[in-house]
Amino acid sequence: MRKVAIYGKGGIGKSTTTQNTVAGLAEMGMKVMVVGCDPKADSTRLLLGGLQQKTVLDTLREEGEEVELEDIIKEGYRQTRCTESGGPEPGVGCAGRGIITSVNLLEQLGAYDKEWGLDYVFYDVLGDVVCGGFAMPIRDGKAEEIYIVCSGEMMAMYAANNICKGILKYADAGGVRLGGLICNSRKVDNEQAMIEELARKIGTQMIHFVPRDNFVQRAEINRKTVIDYDPTHGQADEYRALARKIHENKMFVIPKPLEIEELESLLIDFGIAN
């Protein structure tokens, strides 16, 4: 079973990218579990046809200790197994702590057991690695390969670089490696070349460039992944390509994060900053 975590700046399109990629893997016949590690609990909605599933933490709050696996895992598109860790009540407690509680519970209840025949588990993780809870999939060896969703926007690249610092910190202890950058295009000038260069400097690859297409939003409004909504659309092929590249990927590295000056000079070289 391959254990994959998807990181990236808040709002970059991690959940959308994760679900569309998982749909591509499921279409290839892979058995995938998606663990949403975001208090918004929107990491599985498209795979479940718009169903906002009850989170692990909400279930724990209501049911107490008497939680069964079927209470917190729902089956989605092509038998994908979907669960959401959820978060504390707004203004109370720590969301990162919630992820730790949820993943530990999933393990105790046997969600990862061989009987499920899982080929992949995907962790869709909130934003930047700024707190220990969100770093948990990296830190505790829950995830072994990381993909960072970014774009040619400065803050997305800054976040990607920060996440690399988190991977570097835990690479020796947890055995986690960076599998590549996924460029979720924002139609920034020279975007593809810039992310390829950023990847090269960090010591990794841009595993795929996902072009911007409003069809993704149309599929989302219809509560589906692109592959589910219209398998013949060109954007569906982009996610299939990304799924295939992840499936065939052999390049797993300990990243070399850039100093802020190097990152800024990259932006200047590509005409984003002056």
From Swiss-Prot:
EC assignment: 1.18.6.1
Reactions listed under catalytic activity: N2 + 8 reduced [2Fe-2S]-[ferredoxin] + 16 ATP + 16 H2O = H2 + 8 oxidized [2Fe-2S]-[ferredoxin] + 2 NH4(+) + 16 ADP + 16 phosphate + 6 H(+)
Residues engaged in binding [4Fe-4S] cluster: 94, 131
Residue numbers binding ATP: 8-15
Keyword ATP-binding annotated: yes
GO terms for MF: 4 iron, 4 sulfur cluster binding; ATP binding; metal ion binding; nitrogenase activity
Alphabetized UniProt keyword annotations: 4Fe-4S, ADP-ribosylation, ATP-binding, Iron, Iron-sulfur, Metal-binding, Nitrogen fixation, Nucleotide-binding, Oxidoreductase
Gene3D superfamilies: P-loop containing nucleotide triphosphate hydrolases
Signal sequence interval, chain numbering: none
Cofactor: [4Fe-4S] cluster
Positions bearing ADP-ribosylarginine: 97
Binding note for cofactor: Binds 1 [4Fe-4S] cluster per dimer.
UniProt cross-references to InterPro entries, sorted A to Z: NifH/chlL_CS (IPR030655), NifH/frxC (IPR000392), Nitrogenase_Fe_NifH (IPR005977), P-loop_NTPase (IPR027417)
Post-translational modification: The reversible ADP-ribosylation of Arg-97 inactivates the nitrogenase reductase and regulates nitrogenase activity.
4Fe-4S keyword on record: yes
Pfam family membership, one: Fer4_NifH
Gene Ontology biological process terms, A to Z: nitrogen fixation
UniProt similarity note: Belongs to the NifH/BchL/ChlL family.
NCBIfam families registered for this protein in UniProt: nifH
Alphabetized PANTHER family for the sequence: LIGHT-INDEPENDENT PROTOCHLOROPHYLLIDE REDUCTASE IRON-SULFUR ATP-BINDING PROTEIN (PTHR42864:SF2)
Function summary: The key enzymatic reactions in nitrogen fixation are catalyzed by the nitrogenase complex, which has 2 components: the iron protein and the molybdenum-iron protein.
Protein name in UniProt: Nitrogenase iron protein
Species of the source: Chlorobium phaeobacteroides (strain DSM 266 / SMG 266 / 2430)
